[in-house]
Amino acid sequence: MTRFLDSDAMGDEELVERTLRPQYLREYIGQDKVKDQLKIFIEAAKLRDESLDHVLLFGPPGLGKTTMAFVIANELGVNLKQTSGPAIEKSGDLVAILNDLEPGDVLFIDEIHRMPMAVEEVLYSAMEDFYIDIMIGAGETSRSVHLDLPPFTLIGATTRAGMLSNPLRARFGITGHMEYYEENDLTEIIERTADIFEMKITYEAASELARRSRGTPRIANRLLKRVRDYAQIMGDGLIDDNITDKALTMLDVDHEGLDYVDQKILRTMIEMYNGGPVGLGTLSVNIAEERDTVEDMYEPYLIQKGFIMRTRTGRVATVKAYEHLGYQRFDK
């Protein structure tokens, strides 16, 4: 079964996101705190004719970290070179990328927490003093070569900031916490997407879609496409609040933005463990999902919406979870 509320990109979504991507901070909807800070830091760097300090963007998937990296490069008026932590398998791969940078370039590394430690260590001197030392040759004939780099800005994106080593984290002069979007910002994003793709949607429908999209633009845009399909086949093409509710109900997305996996997590906690506390590993086994998947993909939203609490002894289902699923809560 397809999970429409998965915040990782599916199929051609990365291509679609590039089409929808804003170019400058003034066009970027939401994340006002991060934008306001970046605007000052970028203008100051341009005024001094310096490269921007290295930037770490962290937060759940689908919140626009990659888009923000491109916006930063556009605001600086420089080129952006993109890679990812898993793609840089050895230090030589990173050396080749660094050696190809021009003065002022932005190097964007997505999933930076997944870089091997040997690769990460190459970044330390590159980030701090713009040089790297590389070994040439092997055995007794090997020698170290000092390679100066042009000033550049590294932008790292991660969903797991806690997995970054302290030495790497300390080298980022700017950090931006990307948070779940407010409903009004998400409504505006949905209306913008609908306008770009020439969809007819009412404000009420956009607002309802925003409320059920887990505060995540990627999910909102995905659901919008499926609601459009429903409107074209089951209606006259207009996306109104009635069509939106019927389409999302068909997709098993309830009025709180929970789908069958979220509900399965809560039901397991309530029915099998009397609401908890239950360990994350135990919970993951019971719902047949990987521990990291539960921790990264499902749990953050359930906690943010007040359905689950983290405690020292495990996860606990809240009164809101009982009420939402129609369970009667008995005191232990």
UniProtKB/Swiss-Prot annotation:
InterPro entries: AAA+_ATPase, AAA_lid_4, DNA_helicase_Holl-junc_RuvB, P-loop_NTPase, RuvB-like_N, RuvB_C, WH-like_DNA-bd_sf, WH_DNA-bd_sf
Binding site for DNA: R291, R310, R312, R315
Keywords in alphabetical order: ATP-binding, Cytoplasm, DNA damage, DNA recombination, DNA repair, DNA-binding, Hydrolase, Nucleotide-binding
Chain positions covered by the region annotation Small ATPAse domain (RuvB-S): 182-252
GO biological processes: DNA recombination; DNA repair
Region (Large ATPase domain (RuvB-L)) location: 1-181
Catalytic activity of the protein: ATP + H2O = ADP + phosphate + H(+)
Amino-acid positions noted as binding ATP in the UniProt annotation, renumbered to this chain: L20, R21, G62, K65, T66, T67, E128, D129, F130, R171, Y181, R218
Residues binding Mg(2+): T66
Job description of the protein: The RuvA-RuvB-RuvC complex processes Holliday junction (HJ) DNA during genetic recombination and DNA repair, while the RuvA-RuvB complex plays an important role in the rescue of blocked DNA replication forks via replication fork reversal (RFR). RuvA specifically binds to HJ cruciform DNA, conferring on it an open structure. The RuvB hexamer acts as an ATP-dependent pump, pulling dsDNA into and through the RuvAB complex. RuvB forms 2 homohexamers on either side of HJ DNA bound by 1 or 2 RuvA tetramers; 4 subunits per hexamer contact DNA at a time.
Protein known as: Holliday junction branch migration complex subunit RuvB
Organism: Streptococcus agalactiae serotype V (strain ATCC BAA-611 / 2603 V/R)
Lineage: Bacteria, Bacillati, Bacillota, Bacilli, Lactobacillales
Gene symbol of the encoding locus: ruvB
